UniProtKB/Swiss-Prot annotation:
Gene3D superfamilies, per the entry: GI Alpha 1, domain 2-like (1.10.400.10), P-loop containing nucleotide triphosphate hydrolases (3.40.50.300)
UniProt protein name: Guanine nucleotide-binding protein G(s) subunit alpha
Residues binding Mg(2+), per UniProt: S58, T193
Molecular-function GO terms, alphabetical: G protein-coupled receptor binding; G-protein beta/gamma-subunit complex binding; GTP binding; GTPase activity; metal ion binding
The organism of origin for this protein: Anopheles gambiae (African malaria mosquito)
Matching InterPro entries: Gprotein_alpha_S (IPR000367), Gprotein_alpha_su (IPR001019), GproteinA_insert (IPR011025), P-loop_NTPase (IPR027417)
Short name of any one Pfam family annotated for the protein: G-alpha
Gene name in the database record: G-s-alpha-60A
Region spans: G5 motif: 353-358
Function: Guanine nucleotide-binding proteins (G proteins) are involved as modulators or transducers in various transmembrane signaling systems. The G(s) protein is involved in hormonal regulation of adenylate cyclase: it activates the cyclase. Participates in olfactory signal transduction.
Length: 383
């Protein structure tokens, strides 16, 4: 009996030893995987896009997809058609609706177009509108009307999406049954961002995770969820918004709101060690407004009257001197905030951008990569 017991004991010891070895192999494999995951996590640059609503953050994300992922597939382009049609509908509804509410109100150039306005206001505003051919006909004819054009020119007096003119100019293409949106159409298309969206891409074998968060006031409470382990903040401001007010608060100037928001982020105690890359966006629209001369920057920012173009200003060939002065004034308004309360732990790096211009964003992002790399090394105390 003792011999049998002894053999069973040896077998049991052998099984136990194998189990222990197997558990150790599994444990070692888990440890190696965790170590690998940690290395990948630490090697990833996490970029947080912040800024007020309609500043161009989501357009920056689209550019990263075009430049560093695979752009947009045919099915994704087709899916955007409904959003683009909605942009056209929102634009013509808003403009024709504003004609009678402006002070002084604006009349149609052709009184016979009133029936077209009535159609747009009565039928196109419905929730189940299906964009019949007459909608496009009415929209095209109204967009040619001088009264509608004058109302568009006063769009800073009401809320109108930036892409209104772009898509209203292209109704004849978009209404075609075989229409497929171009990259520029997708970049221009406006869709409200609600929540947090992550885009992952790789540049020269370096991993980037970019987080886009809604910029409207009621969306900003979600920002705190993204602050952990951020490599850098990209703050986006719409420079062309100097003569506009917020959708959510018609008493607040949009550019001043952006400056206030930048100040709150810059002075946030949780972000004191995170540097900010400042995208002074919508330079194309800013230049249009300044050159048109109808909305003077000094009417909204009295300090501009005394402002002189700084010595470090870089001028592009043929650039209007007043446009140069305006864009550097806005830059310096932000830098005044960062230099007033900077403690040497984080820095502000300004760049002039046009988010719908792929070459511009490619050049700017390449310029930023060295900055982001330094921030990443400092984040893990390697610099």
């Amino acid at each position: 009996m003792g011999c049998f017991g002894s053999a069973g004991s040896k077998q049991s010891d052998s099984n136990s030893s194998e189990d222990t070895k197997s558990q150790k192999r599994r444990s070692d494999a888990i440890t190696r995987q965790l170590q690998k995951d940690k290395q990948v996590y630490r090697a990833t640059h996490r970029l947080l896009l912040l800024g007020a609503g309609e500043s161009g953050k989501s357009t920056i994300v689209k550019q990263m997809r075009i430049l560093h992922v695979n752009g947009f597939s045919d099915s994704e382009r087709k899916q955007k058609i409904e959003d683009i049609k909605k942009n056209i509908r929102d634009a013509i509804l808003t403009i024709t609706g504003a004609m009678s509410t402006l002070t002084p109100p604006i009349q149609l150039e052709k009184p016979e177009n009133q029936a077209r306005v009535d159609y747009i206001q009565d039928y196109a505003s419905g929730p189940d509108f299906n964009y019949p051919p007459e909608f496009y006909e009415h929209t095209e004819e109204l967009w040619k009307d001088r009264g509608v054009q004058q109302t568009y020119e006063r769009s800073n007096e009401y809320q109108l999406i930036d892409c209104a003119k772009y898509f209203l100019d292209r109704v004849s293409e978009i209404k075609q049954p075989n229409y497929t949106p171009t990259e520029q159409d997708i970049l221009r298309c406006r869709v409200l961002t609600s929540g947090i969206f992550e885009t992952r891409f790789q540049v020269d074998k370096v991993n980037f995770h970019m987080f886009d968060v809604g910029g409207q006031r009621d969306e900003r409470r979600k920002w705190i969820q993204c602050f952990n382990d951020v490599t850098a903040i990209i703050f986006v401001t719409a420079c062309s918004s100097y003569n506009m007010v917020l959708r959510e608060d018609p008493t607040q100037n949009r550019l001043r709101e952006s400056l206030d928001l930048f100040k709150s982020i810059w002075n946030n105690r949780w972000l004191r060690t995170i540097s900010v890359i400042l995208f002074l966006n919508k330079q194309d629209l800013l230049a249009e407004k300044i050159k048109a001369g109808k909305s003077k920057l000094s009417d909204y920012f009295g300090e501009f009257n005394r402002y002189q173009t700084p010595a470090d200003a870089v001028c592009e060939m043929g650039e209007d001197p007043e446009v140069i002065r305006a864009k550097y004034f806005i830059r310096d308004e932000f830098l005044r905030i960062s230099t007033a309360s900077g403690d040497g732990k984080h820095y502000c790096y300004p760049h002039f951008t046009c988010a719908v211009d792929t070459e511009n964003i490619k050049r700017v992002f390449n310029d930023c990569r060295d900055i982001i790399q330094r921030m990443h090394l400092r984040q893990y105390e390697l610099l």
